[in-house]
């Protein structure tokens, strides 16, 4: 049997190859098969063939159960691809009718014995058996052969004609949608006639393929069954399949499109509508007919593969999107192209959108030249319409159709179920669009520049809520922003988020521009609601929300940045310097003491300049400041170098002392360049040309100074307790010395006392107490100190610069003049070896009272003097032990000796005092002569001096400016006189011997405060 069977099969094969039943006949039979499956057993052209085909369609499941997957692959190809695999057996039976019964028996036995499992023609044999049975039933065993042979040419001619028509239609499909409709109708067998026949049966056919598609759930790599096809089947496919695929593809695509429309939720609805509208007959009848044909084929295919139990058979040609199964790769390709189920959209510019369905390029592995052409033709019209739903459709496709779906075990989970995770990860934070790959998201970001908008979650939320409203406003609002006008409106939000003024939401191209804007508009402040509100109104609610957040952020701007902004602003005008004040008291107004008018805080300084600038001799004071401040660099520095720092500190202080600030501004403002700084210093120190704010400032700071002075006094007391005691002994000398000086300049002293009120007493005690140890007498004698200081300073000012004295005489200028005179004293007295300031700083009450009378006309002057001599006092305490050494050191400072000398002196004094137990009685601890900071080693102390007190020692004023510490090294003798009585004698006659008596109490409190001031200045200057 096996031999006979093999011979018969070989004969059949030869007959098939020779007769070329392949394309035309196969198509006709396929059409007959589909017709037989859908319509009935009768065929108008070839009933016998039809009966055979129908029998094959229906019996193939029974006959094929024994077939192996290979055979199955062959037979399905014949059935599904309209290949003549089924027909070759039928043709053979027709050619060999007498042997059909024997063949049937052989085939039955072979199938039962599974002998034909490996035979690629087993399907043909089974089909031959069924065909012979059907032929016998019809009663004409030979008639099928005769009819078949006769009708083969007819059907062949018909098929050729049909194929020609189909080819024409395919060309027309590429050019016209009508032809596409016909093409859709055309092929189950890839023949138009069969498609037309199937149109009537289309509705049930649609249902059938759907059920079949439901059966086919998981897609397998397409073309897996194609390789087993025999050469003759390949030829058949090449001949008929190429033509029929494209024809069949549109119909299948239409059907799949309808299914996709149902299953793609909202994304494919427009696509389905277009497909149905473009092909009404196709959508309603043709796709149905095609589906019926495919349904017949699917039935044979499905039964064949499912009966074989091949799990992979279900997934051979299955749309992963709509789960619809297809008999051929061409059908699936066409379906995916037309329905865009491949997940790719291509804007094919073909003139004819054959099918109004959104077209997407089929996967490369599924794409064929014909399918590509069809896809391009159909995509032209539908690409624009489908753009709206492309993103959502793509998302669904990404979820449902990872290609390939099953490459390795578990990969389907990653590609399918894990798609959601991937979409969440590869998601545009701006528009929320998800992407299947990083490359897609990258291209999206590049095209839309949405990456510029990824700033913060809160901003993302606000932008999402008001995206549409916000974009136009963003572009419009940031007129100066370079990025805002960029084509993608999204750039403006990103720029505004990064380089945007938090007050007015104006975007800037660079940080420098933003800083300039903030400094000029004072938008670095939190409160400028007026400036912020108009832009906010323009931008809309979302922007207002962002504005609020921006205000919060601007609140958190670093002090350094604020100081920088203030400094930059102060260079142009004081408005920027007053920005914090304006913020603090935007609604408050300060009454000008000169004109009595109420002026806004931000504008008060300028007003003061105008009102007081003329009346107050600014140049003399400035010149004095130049001369006097050099001796007392703290003032000079405050006036010149640290304007931004001082302004920043001023503003901070002024905010807390608004009213005082205004007054301070009044007097401080008149010194145009240096005065604001000096005024700010006076304000901080509580020294005001107008005593009103001097007292409050001093009161506020007085407590702090007193505390620091007491603490430092305690610290320095140990260091300079002996020196202070010596000072106390020298205090009378100082007091006397002070009177001696006061006679030298009797005129100036009277004005300072009026200038200095009881408030100055309080303030002065702070300063004086710090300097003098905060003794009660000192506090009480602050007024006298001012007088005495005026007298004492007047000699200095006379020697240094008479202008300061003249200025001091006026009550308003008295404080400033006193300060200048103090600076003069610091420089002049120290240079001349005067220890008057030291007397003022003496901790002893008598010294305090005398020092109060001394040239410390103002707390600020005393403070600056202390700053200059604060460190020396501690050294003075140390040097107080030896008046001669103090005197020598005093001589060095008075001579404005090199910083190096002062530095060496400070180091030596600290070491000596430590060795003498002056530093808290512990010889192992070295205390800074300037700030009383304890150090365990000389190296640490030297480092401290170099980093803190001698940073600006390069200039004579710089040490002083740096801090009393700086000058104190120079005026260490002076400082020591302060702390030591030597200074008080020096005050009287500028006697170096008394200078040895140092009042460490004076230095330590004063030095603390001064150091604090210096550090603040340095910090602000660095920041600024």
Curated annotation (Swiss-Prot):
Bias kind Low complexity: ranges: 368-391, 477-489, 527-537, 718-729, 874-891, 968-990
Basic and acidic residues bias locations: 786-795
MF GO annotations: DNA binding; DNA-binding transcription factor activity, RNA polymerase II-specific; zinc ion binding
Extra remark beyond the main annotation: The tsh tio gene pair seems to have arisen from a recent duplication event: tsh has the dominant role compared to tio.
This protein's encoding gene: tio
Zinc fingers (C2H2-type) by residue: 317-341, 426-450, 499-523, 926-949
Tissue: Expression in the Malpighian tubules (MTs) and stomatogastric nervous system starts at embryonic stage 10. At stage 11, expression in the head domain is initiated in the clypeolabrum in two bilaterally symmetric clusters of cells. At stage 12, expression appears in the central nervous system (CNS) of the trunk and the epidermis. The staining in the hindgut is maintained throughout embryogenesis. At stage 13, expression is present in elongating MTs. The anterior staining is detected in cells that invaginate into the stomodeum and by stage 15 onwards, in cells close to the pharynx.
Biased segments, Acidic residues type: 159-175
InterPro entries assigned: Teashirt_fam (IPR027008), ZN622/Rei1/Reh1_Znf-C2H2 (IPR041661), Znf_C2H2_sf (IPR036236), Znf_C2H2_type (IPR013087)
Composition skew (Basic residues), residue ranges: 543-558
Record's protein name: Protein tiptop
GO CC terms, sorted: nucleus
GO BP, one annotated term: specification of segmental identity, head
Location of the protein in the cell: Nucleus
Biased composition (Pro residues): 745-755
Extent of Polar residues compositional bias: 20-35, 796-808
Disordered, as annotated region: 20-40, 138-215, 350-392, 466-489, 519-576, 712-759, 786-818, 868-891, 954-1004
Organism listed in the record: Drosophila melanogaster (Fruit fly)
UniProtKB keywords: Activator, Developmental protein, DNA-binding, Metal-binding, Nucleus, Repeat, Repressor, Transcription, Transcription regulation, Zinc, Zinc-finger
Stretches of the chain forming a coiled coil according to its record: none
Similarity comment: Belongs to the teashirt C2H2-type zinc-finger protein family.
Function recorded in the entry: Tiptop (tio) and teashirt (tsh) have, on the whole, common activities. Tio and tsh repress each other's expression and tsh has a crucial role for trunk patterning that is in part masked by ectopic expression of tiptop. Both genes share a common activity required for the activation of Ser and svb and the maintenance of en and wg.
């Amino acid at each position: 049997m096996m031999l006979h069977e093999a011979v018969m099969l070989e004969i059949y094969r030869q007959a098939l190859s020779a007769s070329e039943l392949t394309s035309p006949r196969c198509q006709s039979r396929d059409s007959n098969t589909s017709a037989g499956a859908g319509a009935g057993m009768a065929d108008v052209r070839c009933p016998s063939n039809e009966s055979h085909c129908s029998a094959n369609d229906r019996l193939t499941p029974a006959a094929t159960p024994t077939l192996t997957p290979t055979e199955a692959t062959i037979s399905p190809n014949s059935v599904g691809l309209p290949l003549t695999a089924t027909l070759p057996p039928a043709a053979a039976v027709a050619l060999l009718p007498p042997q059909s019964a024997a063949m049937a028996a052989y085939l039955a036995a072979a199938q039962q014995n599974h002998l034909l499992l490996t035979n690629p023609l087993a399907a043909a044999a089974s089909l031959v058996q069924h065909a012979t049975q059907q032929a016998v039933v019809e009663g004409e065993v030979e008639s099928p052969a005769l009819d078949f042979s006769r009708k083969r040419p007819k059907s062949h001619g018909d098929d050729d004609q049909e194929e020609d028509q189909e080819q024409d239609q395919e060309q027309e499909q590429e050019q016209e949608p009508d032809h596409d409709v016909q093409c859709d109708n055309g092929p189950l067998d890839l023949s138009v006639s069969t498609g037309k026949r199937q149109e009537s049966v289309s509705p049930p056919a649609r249902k059938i393929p759907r059920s079949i598609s439901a059966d086919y759930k998981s897609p397998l790599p397409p073309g897996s069954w194609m390789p087993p096809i025999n050469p003759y089947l390949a030829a058949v496919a090449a001949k008929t399949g190429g033509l029929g695929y494209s024809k069949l593809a549109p119909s299948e695509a239409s059907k799949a499109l309808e299914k996709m429309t149902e299953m793609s939720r909202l994304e494919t609805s427009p696509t389905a509508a277009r497909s149905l509208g473009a092909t009404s007959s196709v959508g309603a009848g043709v796709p149905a007919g095609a589906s019926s044909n495919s349904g017949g084929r699917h039935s044979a295919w499905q039964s064949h593969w499912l009966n074989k139990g091949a799990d992979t058979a279900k997934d051979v040609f299955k749309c992963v999107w709509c789960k619809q199964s297809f008999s051929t790769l061409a059908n699936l390709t066409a379906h995916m192209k037309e329905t865009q189920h491949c997940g790719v959209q291509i804007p094919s510019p073909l003139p004819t959108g054959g099918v109004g369905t959104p077209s997407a390029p089929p996967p490369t592995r599924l794409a064929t030249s014909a399918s590509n052409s069809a896809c391009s033709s159909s995509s032209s019209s539908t690409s624009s319409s489908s753009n709206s739903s492309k993103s959502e459709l793509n998302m669904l496709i990404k979820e449902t159709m990872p290609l390939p779906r099953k490459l390795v075990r578990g990969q389907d989970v990653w590609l399918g179920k894990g798609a959601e995770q991937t979409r969440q990860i590869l998601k545009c934070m701006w528009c929320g669009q998800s992407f299947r790959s990083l490359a897609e998201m990258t291209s999206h970001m590049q095209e839309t520049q949405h990456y510029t908008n990824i700033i913060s979650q809160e901003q993302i939320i606000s932008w999402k809520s008001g995206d549409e409203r916000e974009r136009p406003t963003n572009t419009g609002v940031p007129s100066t922003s370079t990025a805002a006008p960029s084509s993608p409106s999204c750039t403006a939000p990103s720029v505004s988020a990064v380089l945007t003024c938090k007050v007015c939401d104006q975007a800037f191209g660079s940080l420098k521009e933003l800083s300039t804007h903030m400094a000029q508009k004072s938008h670095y402040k939190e409160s400028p609601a007026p400036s912020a509100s108009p832009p906010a109104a323009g931008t809309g609610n979302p922007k207002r929300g962002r504005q609020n957040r921006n205000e919060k952020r601007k609140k958190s701007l670093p002090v350094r940045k604020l100081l920088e902004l203030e400094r930059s602003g102060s260079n142009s005008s004081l408005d920027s310097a007053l920005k914090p004040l304006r913020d603090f008291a935007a609604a408050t107004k300060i009454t000008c003491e000169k004109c009595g008018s109420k002026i806004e805080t931000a504008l008060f300084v300028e007003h003061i300049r105008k009102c007081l600038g003329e009346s107050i001799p600014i140049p003399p004071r400035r010149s004095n400041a130049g001369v006097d401040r050099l001796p007392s660099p703290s003032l000079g520095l405050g006036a010149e170098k640290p304007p931004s720092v001082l302004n920043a500190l001023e503003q901070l202080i002024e905010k807390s002392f608004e009213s005082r600030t205004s007054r301070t501004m009044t007097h401080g403002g008149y010194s145009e360049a240096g005065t604001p700084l000096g005024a700010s210093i006076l304000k901080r120190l509580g020294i005001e040309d107008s005593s009103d704010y001097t007292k409050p400032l001093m009161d506020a700071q007085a407590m702090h100074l007193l505390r620091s002075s007491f603490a430092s006094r305690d610290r320095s007391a140990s260091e300079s307790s002996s020196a202070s005691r010596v000072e106390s002994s020298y205090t009378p000398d100082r007091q006397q010395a002070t009177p001696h000086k006061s006679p030298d300049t009797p005129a100036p002293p009277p004005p300072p006392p009026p200038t200095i009120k009881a408030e100055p007493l309080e303030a002065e005690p702070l300063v004086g107490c710090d300097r003098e140890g905060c003794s009660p007498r000192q506090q009480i004698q602050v007024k006298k100190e001012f007088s005495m200081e005026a007298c004492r300073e007047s000699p200095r000012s006379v020697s240094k610069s008479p202008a300061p004295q003249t200025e001091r005489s006026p009550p308003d200028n008295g404080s400033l003049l006193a300060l200048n005179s103090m600076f003069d004293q610091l420089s002049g007295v120290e240079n001349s070896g005067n220890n008057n300031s030291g007397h003022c700083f003496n901790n002893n009450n008598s010294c305090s009272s005398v020092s109060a009378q001394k040239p410390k006309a103002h707390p600020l002057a005393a403070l600056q003097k202390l700053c200059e001599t604060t460190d020396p006092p501690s050294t003075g305490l140390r040097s107080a032990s030896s008046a001669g050494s103090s005197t020598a050191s005093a001589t060095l400072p008075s001579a404005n000796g090199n910083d190096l000398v002062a530095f060496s002196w400070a180091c030596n004094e600290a070491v000596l005092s430590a060795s003498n137990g002056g530093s808290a009685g512990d010889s192992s601890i070295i205390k800074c002569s300037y700030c009383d900071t304890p150090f365990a080693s000389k190296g640490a102390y030297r480092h401290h001096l170099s980093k803190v007190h001698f940073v600006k020692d390069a200039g004579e004023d710089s040490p002083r400016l740096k801090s009393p510490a700086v000058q104190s090294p120079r005026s260490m003798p002076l400082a020591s006189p302060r702390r030591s009585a030597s200074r008080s004698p020096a005050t009287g006659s500028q006697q170096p011997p008394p200078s040895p008596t140092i009042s460490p109490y004076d230095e330590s409190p004063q030095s603390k405060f001064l150091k604090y001031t210096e550090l603040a200045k340095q910090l602000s200057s660095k920041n600024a």
